[in-house]
């Protein structure tokens, strides 16, 4: 099932499901998207290969979740991207929810995880990683490991990191979609149970861990080159620092 029609809107069902499911479980409020970043488009290629690339942004917030945001890139059969990340408020020790769903001319790249604040803390792993390992193992049987990824990135991923490169679009539409649903459900279960942190030392550690993660993601964002090519360097850097990974900017404003 590798049809063009299927690929063109490959990740729209993921996005639609996530928003509807979150609405059913959370009291979602809009999160402000800076002017000029709600959507953008560019025409790339020439002649028969000409294609419009459209990037659309979505953002929400709740009492426990500082920013729930998605960047959806649609550029025809050979370019489909959904980057969907949930950032908790700084007074919760929740992990980040991260889904990177990417289709390029060379194939599909899928990354799903609950990215830990404190990866090497055994109590943190017991609280947030061990409960989801059965979900990881169940899906890993059908979604083989995607191969090496940068060593510098490893501290930001949990032992339940689902990283795979499916060959078939049908696998994305079925098994990857099922994994996405299960990970999101488990994450919202954690959110439901989460209690605010009040200890000042722990709050400092959470803030430092969040900033460490966001700085890494902003610096190493693999979409930077793609966005620069489509929309220019100025728009790209502002989109990355002012929307996709905006915590540092928000904290500066608060000061």
From Swiss-Prot:
Keywords: Oxidoreductase. The keyword Oxidoreductase applies. Disulfide bonds: none annotated. It holds the Pfam family Fe_bilin_red. InterPro entries: Ferredoxin-dep_bilin_Rdtase (IPR009249), Phycoerythrobilin_Fdx_Rdtase (IPR022827). GO terms for molecular function: cobalt ion binding; phycoerythrobilin:ferredoxin oxidoreductase activity. Its EC number is 1.3.7.3. One of its GO terms (biological process) is phytochromobilin biosynthetic process. The keyword Metal-binding does not apply. It catalyses: (3Z)-phycoerythrobilin + oxidized 2[4Fe-4S]-[ferredoxin] = 15,16-dihydrobiliverdin + reduced 2[4Fe-4S]-[ferredoxin] + 2 H(+). It is an enzyme of class 1 (oxidoreductase). HAMAP family: PebB. Catalyzes the two-electron reduction of the C2 and C3(1) diene system of 15,16-dihydrobiliverdin. Belongs to the HY2 family. NCBIfam families: PRK13250.1 (NF009723). This is Phycoerythrobilin:ferredoxin oxidoreductase. It comes from Nostoc punctiforme (strain ATCC 29133 / PCC 73102). The lineage of its organism: Bacteria, Bacillati, Cyanobacteriota, Cyanophyceae, Nostocales.
């Amino acid at each position: 099932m590798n049809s063009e029609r299927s690929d063109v809107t490959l990740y729209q069902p993921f996005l639609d499901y996530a928003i509807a499911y979150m609405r059913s479980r959370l009291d979602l409020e809009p999160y402000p998207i800076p002017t000029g970043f709600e959507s953008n488009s560019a025409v790339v290629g020439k002649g028969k290969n000409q294609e419009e690339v459209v990037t659309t942004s979505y953002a929400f917030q709740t009492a426990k979740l500082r920013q729930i945001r998605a960047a959806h890139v649609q550029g025809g059969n050979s370019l489909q991207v959904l980057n969907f990340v949930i950032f908790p408020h700084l007074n919760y020790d929740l992990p980040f929810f991260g889904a990177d769903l990417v289709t390029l001319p060379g194939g599909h790249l899928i990354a799903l995880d609950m990215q830990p604040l404190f990866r090497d803390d055994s109590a943190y792993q017991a609280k947030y990683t061990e409960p989801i390992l059965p979900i990881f193992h169940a899906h890993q049987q059908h979604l083989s490991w995607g191969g090496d990824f940068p060593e510098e990135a490893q501290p930001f991923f949990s032992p339940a990191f689902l990283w795979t490169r499916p060959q078939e679009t049908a696998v994305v539409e079925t098994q990857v979609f099922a994994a996405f649903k299960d990970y999101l459900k488990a994450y919202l279960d954690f959110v439901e149970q989460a209690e605010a942190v009040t200890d000042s030392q722990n709050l400092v550690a959470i803030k430092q861990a969040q900033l460490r993660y966001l700085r890494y993601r902003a610096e190493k964002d693999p979409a930077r080159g793609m966005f620069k090519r489509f929309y220019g360097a100025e728009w790209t850097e502002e989109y990355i620092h002012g929307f996709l990974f905006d915590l540092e900017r928000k904290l500066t404003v608060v000061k």
